């Protein structure tokens, strides 16, 4: 198993403070594309049974905190395609900052904005920090400033 995928779980519940800060800046999320009832960030969400990868992401602004295992590349590709194909205006993602991976090249070439978060994110109830750095990645059809803020704090 790769060191990049050495965590005991690939499910990391979204920190509520981060969601609140992002919604203040970007507007409310209309669809959480990969959630569970216990961690969905909005009223509409796709869980395992609905398989978000098989659905159209139809909302002005979607939220994505995908499973962080080996399948993460499919989620990143789906986020980029959903914006590119016009299914949604924007997909905001919380991702591990794994800039050396193949899937990160989709982020590099198609994301409108990348914000590397300082320190380690405290997921779920915040009992412990993630064993990896994180970034907020925004795929969006609108123009954004060309400079990417680094070290943004919610």
Where are the regions a protein language model picked out?
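Class I S-adenosyl-L-methionine-dependent methyltransferase catalytic core
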Residues: 1-154
């Amino acid at each position: 198993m790769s060191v990049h995928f050495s965590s005991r779980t690939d499910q990391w519940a979204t920190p509520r403070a981060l969601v609140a800060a992002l919604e203040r800046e970007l507007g409310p999320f209309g669809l959480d594309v990969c959630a569970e009832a216990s961690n969905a960030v909005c009223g509409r969400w796709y869980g395992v049974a609905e398989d978000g990868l098989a659905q159209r992401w139809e909302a002005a602004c979607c939220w994505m905190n995908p499973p962080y295992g080996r399948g993460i590349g499919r989620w990143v590709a789906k986020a980029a395609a959903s914006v590119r194909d016009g299914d949604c205006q924007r997909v905001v993602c919380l991702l591990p900052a794994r800039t050396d991976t193949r899937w990160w090249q989709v982020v590099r070439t198609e994301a409108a904005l990348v914000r590397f978060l300082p320190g380690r994110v405290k997921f779920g109830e915040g009992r412990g920090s993630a064993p990896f750095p994180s970034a907020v990645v925004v795929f969006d059809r609108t123009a954004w400033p060309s400079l990417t803020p680094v070290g943004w704090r919610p």
